[in-house]
A protein has these predicted regions:
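Short helix/turn-capping signatures at newly exposed starts of structured segments
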Residues: 1-96, 107-109, 115-156
Length: 156
């Protein structure tokens, strides 16, 4: 998608662009803070590489324990819905949270992440999948972390 198509999608959902940079935006669940972004393909600045946004409000760290159960239940509902649309996801989990990934035939990937505090989603373009696969080949062939030119960390 082009950046302008992503902006149109952002606007269609009623998300409010940041005043200084429309690639960042505020969703209805944000509590007024920027909680979404549109990534730009480094090779083609008019092409979007990904869109990232929260599906729930980001809770403060001292939230009531029962909220954790609600977020986990909601996360499971999102996983079930996406599994029914796109097939079984790959899953990773840790003490911090869970991550489910759907790699579609179109080479778009959907990454759903959940912690005790929030649920977010990243929808990546085929170009991002190409980059991820190239990075994995680099490491599979013995490349080390210090020699990697591009590393993506997800704050879940």
């Amino acid at each position: 998608m082009t950046i302008n198509e992503e902006f149109a999608l952002r606007d269609q959902f009623g998300w409010k662009p940041a005043p200084d940079d429309g690639r960042f935006f505020i969703t209805a669940v944000s509590g007024g803070e920027e909680d979404g972004s549109i990534g730009v393909d480094p090779d083609g600045r008019s092409i979007a590489s990904e869109i990232n946004f929260n599906l729930t409000t980001r809770l403060y760290s001292g939230a009531e324990p029962q909220i954790d159960h609600i977020i986990r239940s909601q996360y499971g509902s999102y996983v079930d819905a996406l599994n029914s649309l796109y097939g079984q996801s790959s899953t990773e989990s840790s003490t911090v949270g869970a991550l489910n990934v759907w790699n579609l035939r179109s080479r778009v990937s959907i990454v759903l992440g959940g912690t005790r505090r929030f649920i977010d989603v990243v929808i990546e373009s085929p170009a991002m999948m190409d980059l991820t696969e190239a990075e994995q080949r680099y490491f599979d062939e013995g490349g080390d972390l210090l020699g990697a030119s591009t590393i993506y960390w997800r704050d879940l």
